[in-house]
């Protein structure tokens, strides 16, 4: 069973602890912190009000089920659950096992004027699945039982999955046939294929496999207006692409029940290589040139100087002698205090990997890059899904961590990255609080790159103070993203936390078009209101 107030499963052995070295580092970076009292599951269950739903055979109104579906995985969600300050719950939870049952639930919702929230893996970090304050009954539809591969067409390289299939099961089922989807967001262990489509997600190796919009070939969506079936067509010039209406729709138009995806044969080999460069500017240049020269890598990730140093020392724990030795060795090769760390991946046949790996190394060397020989790339691959597990031990020690992400054209990358990070770093200066912020580029394109900033700060004297600090930090970062013409989200989606910034990206007419499309499928605003677009009670 999933943890009710954090990341992972209750029986997981992947929980993390803060060692003394990391505690000392955090104290030096943002100051000493103190733990806050944590609410229990029983504490929160006691706050669940009586349901407003009438009885239905497919709907569970048990208070614990309602608590477990009340929040996602954003920092505000974490603060709500750990403080016990949860003020909205779904009135009931349904777990359909078929498209027919989803259809039945939507007919019931339409007839009884229910608010409907689709729920995949519950991994949203921007408030996608949180109920808004409403007088209407709220029904959360958990797709977790529609979680298997329904069909595979190896000749066309297509597979059909129930929308509630989580990442590991997607890969497990495809592997039996010698295939992979290759979609590995950091939430991969818990997030679902339907959620990936609904939030327009991006996997860590999207440079090779493509983002979810490249992998999504078609599927079925149940709406209040009927069933929308999207056929799998390799290419078409027959008007607008209907798939685009569903990609990133965040449950506003309907519930995705089946997803048809484009699959790839399992690669013979995969390698991850770390290279150090003398400066951020050099690293950005190399990342841009590698992609624009079409070097066939599967991933390029570039950490700025602060992230490079932070990751090396955080990973070292109490014994940092290995990092000190690495820095000494790099210094002797011209890589000093401004160093940055690039991790690139190669995926494919053995011959392809050998050729591309060497080509990339040669290009890096031409810019003063020094290749790591100690296996840091393998370490990254081994721990690629571990970061979310760190939030609980950080929180238990009185610290908070969160992220902001965007994407901009290459010409804007250096300035945007610097200003977003600096705005976050200084957002709590009026309180005399330090914020440790650092940045990486994780998805690169010929036109530009994503920018992903992580920040750590002290929760303070109470969970409410921690929430107030988060609001200031979020606002500071988001305003810089808008000021630099970036997307308000490259991979997390809009949800509730980003909705106020969407109009800067889409424009007045664009927002009106999206709103009209939502109203076509959902004229009374019952489907996940308050997400993607501003909330309006119909």
Identify the residue ranges that each predicted region occupies.
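N-terminal flexible segment immediately upstream of the FAD-binding catalytic core
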Residues: 1-107, 125-157, 309-314, 378-403, ...
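FAD-binding subdomain of flavoenzyme oxidoreductases
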Residues: 147-303
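Short, well-ordered beta-strand elements within core beta-sheets of diverse protein domains
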Residues: 91-97, 271-278, 344-346, 404-408
